[in-house]
Regions:
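A conserved regulatory-domain signal marking ACT and ACT-like small-molecule sensing domains
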Residues: 2-10, 36, 41-138
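Short beta-strand-centered segments at strand-helix junctions
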Residues: 9-42
Length: 138
């Protein structure tokens, strides 16, 4: 397989077979330079995103929002700043799925200056938050 290197991007078609691994071109793997990738499926858009990562210690933070206010993002930003959570691999931002409103992000917890439990507790205190899920991605 020849990879087009002329422009800003390269593309290949990958074949999906249920229950079978997806194989990436050797040139892609070499250029990425990492041994693992965080793969995210965005349900609404049916889009998969792949992020090369150096660590497999990655957490999902999902906040279910029952009442989205103008202050939600400000309070979320304060909680992230207090925890020193700034290096986020991917975020949905605030989005709807059906009747529910969510904020989701994926991050490496090594950057935090608080425990995961402390981060979770601070997020639960934000007005309008009905549920917080914080778990390691497998």
């Amino acid at each position: 397989m020849v990879i087009d290197r002329e422009g800003a991007t390269s593309a290949v078609i990958l074949r999906f077979t249920a229950g079978k691994p997806v194989e990436f071109p050797a040139e892609f793997v070499k250029e990425i330079g990492e041994k693992a990738g965080l793969t995210i499926l965005h349900h609404k858009d049916r889009v998969m995103k792949l992020f090369p990562v150096a660590s497999d210690n990655i957490y999902l933070l999902r906040i279910e929002i029952s009442d989205l206010s103008r202050n939600f993002l400000k309070q979320l930003n304060y909680a992230f700043n207090d925890a020193k959570l700034s290096d986020i691999i991917f975020t949905t931002g605030v989005c709807l799925r059906g009747e529910k409103c969510y904020y989701e992000c994926y991050f490496v917890p090594d950057q935090l200056v608080v425990s995961l439990d402390e981060l979770e507790d601070s997020l639960k205190m934000i007005d309008g938050v009905s549920r917080v899920v914080l778990r390691k991605v497998e």
